[in-house]
């Protein structure tokens, strides 16, 4: 059977994991705080906050910004969480075509999907390739939309010398083993 990922851990990593397990604090402890600070600094973000999964990382901003029935533009080629977290927050995902060469969100198609209920756009960086930041930000400004960037497959990716993790409004990562890191 072909596995999803081969786990290769150093002795130091194993010892660090054991120390956390022995501390009894599997969440919100000093290691978690240190990781949040170090990862935020690594990607150039002002703040970093961990969650239990990439899906929950996407759910949190939608809970804070959407009213029931608000729409979010989502690429049609993505992991299910991109749209399902919009629905879980009471919003309505509106699917947008993707560019056939990059599989990234097609802003020309997105233009035709904007309504008075559209509140956000959810561009997904795929395969380590970042979305066109100036184009997405210009689109969002034009339509007064928030941006929830899905960077689950873009650890270390950048655009014009800026890590995707430093972009506004919200950037969400996932550390699931099948994501490229």
PLM ranges: what are they?
Residues 1-25, 30, 145:
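N-terminal "arm"/small-domain region of PLP-dependent enzymes with the aminotransferase-like
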Residues 6-7, 97, 126, 174:
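Conserved donor-binding loops in enzymes that form glycosidic bonds
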Residues 18, 22, 36-40, 59, ...:
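Solvent-exposed, non-membrane alpha-helical residues enriched in polar/charged side chains
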Residues 24, 142, 178-180:
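Short Gly/Pro-enriched turn/cap motifs at secondary-structure boundaries
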Residues 25-71, 85-89, 94-97, 162:
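Phosphate-binding glycine-rich loop
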Residues 64-151, 158:
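PLP-dependent aminotransferase-like
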Residues 149-181:
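Conserved active-site segment immediately N-terminal to the catalytic lysine
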């Amino acid at each position: 059977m072909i596995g999803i990922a081969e786990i290769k851990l150093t002795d130091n990593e194993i010892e660090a994991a054991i120390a956390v397990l022995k501390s009894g604090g599997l969440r919100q402890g000093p290691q978690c705080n240190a990781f949040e600070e170090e990862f935020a600094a690594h990607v150039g973000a002002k703040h970093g906050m961990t969650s239990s999964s990439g899906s929950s990382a996407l759910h949190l901003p939608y809970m804070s910004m959407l009213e029931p029935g608000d729409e979010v533009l989502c690429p049609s080629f993505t992991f299910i969480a991109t749209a399902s977290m919009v629905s879980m927050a009471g919003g309505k995902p509106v699917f947008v075509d993707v560019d056939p060469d990059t599989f990234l969100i097609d802003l020309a198609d997105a233009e035709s999907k904007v309504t008075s209920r559209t509140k956000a756009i959810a561009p997904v960086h795929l395969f380590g390739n970042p979305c066109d930041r100036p184009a997405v930000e210009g689109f969002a400004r034009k339509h007064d939309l928030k941006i929830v960037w899905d960077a689950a497959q873009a650890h270390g990716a950048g655009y014009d010398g800026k890590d995707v993790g430093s972009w506004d409004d919200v950037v969400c990562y996932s550390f699931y083993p099948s994501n490229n890191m």
